[in-house]
């Protein structure tokens, strides 16, 4: 009777029938003779005891003990007979053993050969395990190729030829190529890396070099590249626009500085009009004056400046020139018909306008060291004249145009500034101080104040030439003031 369901092919009869004597009695010394041992063995029950190693005996004892504890085996021996659960050798066991080393070695080999193999052992097969793929990623380990052959590389070469512009397969493409070529992912990746290296070495590189990145990542698609280029272009245009705006603002600031500087320097334009020092509003902001006694003389409309902006200053200059020239042309036509002195006076005024006057500058006036270089607007002939002018010629009253109002010269308001900055004795001269104090001048020049250009002379040293503005064709008027114009060279200072 056996129990194959437990994997133990034991029969119902015990394999070991031995006495409960100690194992030491089984192995006795060689001093006893074989006949003595045979006589002792005949007194007991004969036992068949094959030779086992101690390891096998210990295993057998454990298995029998566990089986008896489970109640599978009933103990065939009673306690009166002296048999326990543990198998022991009889007293005369040495009759069955020989202590010869060679015989024991032979017997041990035969004992191993007779042990049957248990049915619970199965040879390991990786296909029956839970993970049906081996570590190389294929179903059958025997079909795995250790080295790439010509057939497998032909497939990879074909794919590389189709993707010469971008020889970087994605993860999915690598898996597909690995299945087709029965290669691993590592082999496919290595092959492509070597192929790219070979093409680069042979200068057959047709793809743009990438930055340092893994082989699993593929470069951007064409659409993504176009979007990236468009974004870069947009950012570049924005930066360019901002730079242009900044440059334009800086240029505007520079131009504004230049305009301010030009406005200061060109305070007096080519026209003989200057901005009034004190603005006094009048009706129509215009002054009308007549040159002659009769009504046949023309009217000259002189626009007085109201604001001090540079743009209006330039406009006033242009209007003044244009108006003066147009009126002179009309007067020339009338003078031909009348043949009087009006054509002559208009022609003389046109000559004065053509000769560009010297720009009257406060800085030049303040820094000039010679008294004769001051313009005539600083000196008033009526009741007061410089010593040089009084010595050279006498004052003669000449009819001039009467102006509706008079403006104070800016030099009188700058007297304190001149006295505070320039401490030269020349500026402290009593005559000059008296002249600066009593100076009053009109800012509007008229056509009637005409000067013969031939009589202009340059004053040298302390001698000055006072130009007489006597007009032959105009009647003498004692109520009019005579203004002495003091010049330097052929260029007239005017205000």
UniProtKB/Swiss-Prot annotation:
Example GO biological process: dorsal/ventral pattern formation
Organism (species): Xenopus laevis (African clawed frog)
Lineage, highest ranks first: Eukaryota, Metazoa, Chordata, Craniata, Vertebrata
Positions with biased composition (Basic and acidic residues): 235-245
Claim: Transmembrane helix is one of the keywords in the record: no
Function noted in UniProt: Acts partially redundantly with other irx members in neural patterning. Required for formation of the posterior forebrain, midbrain, hindbrain, and to a lesser extent, spinal cord. Patterns the neuroectoderm in both the anterior/posterior and dorsal/ventral axes. Does not appear to play a role in pronephros kidney development.
GO CC annotations on file: nucleus
Gene3D superfamilies to which the protein is assigned, alphabetical: Homeodomain-like
Swiss-Prot/TrEMBL keywords: Developmental protein, Differentiation, DNA-binding, Homeobox, Neurogenesis, Nucleus, Transcription, Transcription regulation
DNA-binding region: 141-203
SMART domains the record matches: HOX, IRO
Transmembrane segments: none
Protein name as it appears in the record: Iroquois-class homeodomain protein irx-4-B
Main localisation: nucleus
Region (Disordered): 203-245
Family membership: Belongs to the TALE/IRO homeobox family.
GO MF terms held by the record: DNA-binding transcription factor activity, RNA polymerase II-specific; RNA polymerase II cis-regulatory region sequence-specific DNA binding
């Amino acid at each position: 009777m056996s129990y194959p369901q437990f994997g133990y092919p034991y029969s119902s009869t015990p394999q070991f029938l031995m006495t409960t004597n100690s194992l030491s009695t089984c192995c006795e010394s060689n001093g006893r003779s074989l006949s003595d041992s045979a006589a002792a063995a005949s007194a007991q029950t004969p036992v068949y005891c094959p030779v086992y190693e101690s390891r096998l005996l210990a295993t057998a004892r454990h298995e029998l003990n566990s089986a008896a504890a489970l109640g599978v085996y009933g103990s065939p021996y009673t306690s009166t007979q002296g048999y326990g659960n543990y198998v022991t050798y009889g007293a005369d066991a040495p009759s069955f053993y020989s202590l010869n080393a060679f015989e024991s070695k032979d017997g041990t080999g035969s004992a191993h050969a007779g042990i049957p193999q248990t049915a619970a052992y199965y040879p390991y097969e990786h296909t029956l395990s839970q993970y049906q793929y081996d570590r190389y990623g294929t179903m059958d380990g025997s079909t795995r190729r250790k080295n790439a052959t010509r057939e497998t590389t032909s497939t990879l070469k074909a794919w590389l030829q189709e993707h010469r512009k971008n020889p970087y397969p994605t993860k999915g493409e690598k898996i597909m190529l690995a299945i087709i070529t029965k290669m691993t992912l590592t082999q496919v990746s290595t092959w492509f890396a070597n192929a790219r290296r070979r093409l680069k070495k042979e200068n057959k590189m047709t793809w743009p070099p990438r930055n340092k990145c893994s082989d699993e990542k593929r470069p951007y698609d064409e659409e993504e590249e176009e979007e990236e280029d468009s974004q870069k272009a947009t950012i570049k245009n924005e930066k360019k626009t901002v730079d242009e705006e900044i440059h334009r603002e800086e240029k505007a600031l520079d131009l504004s500085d230049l305009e301010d500087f030009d406005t200061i320097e060109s305070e007096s334009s080519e026209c003989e009009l200057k901005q009034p020092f004190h603005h006094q509003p009048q009706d129509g902001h215009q002054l009308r004056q007549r040159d002659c006694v009769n009504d046949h003389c023309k009217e000259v409309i002189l626009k007085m400046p109201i604001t001090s902006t540079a743009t209006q200053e330039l406009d006033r200059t242009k209007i003044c020139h244009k108006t003066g020239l147009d009126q002179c042309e009309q007067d020339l036509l009338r003078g031909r018909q009348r043949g009087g002195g009006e054509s002559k006076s208009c022609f003389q005024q046109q000559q004065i306008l053509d000769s560009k006057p010297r720009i009257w500058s406060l800085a030049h006036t303040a820094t000039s060291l010679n008294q004769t270089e001051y313009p005539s607007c600083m000196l008033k002939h009526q009741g007061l004249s410089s010593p040089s002018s009084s010595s050279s010629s006498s004052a003669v009253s000449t009819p001039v145009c009467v102006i509706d109002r008079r403006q104070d010269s800016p030099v009188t308001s700058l007297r304190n500034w001149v006295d505070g900055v320039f401490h030269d004795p020349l500026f402290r001269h009593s005559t000059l101080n008296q002249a600066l104090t009593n100076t009053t001048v009109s800012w509007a020049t008229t056509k009637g104040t005409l000067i013969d250009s031939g009589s202009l002379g340059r004053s040298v040293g302390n001698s000055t030439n006072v130009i007489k503005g006597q007009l032959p064709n105009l009647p003498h008027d004692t109520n009019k003031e005579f203004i002495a114009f003091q010049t330097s060279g052929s260029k007239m200072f005017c205000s």
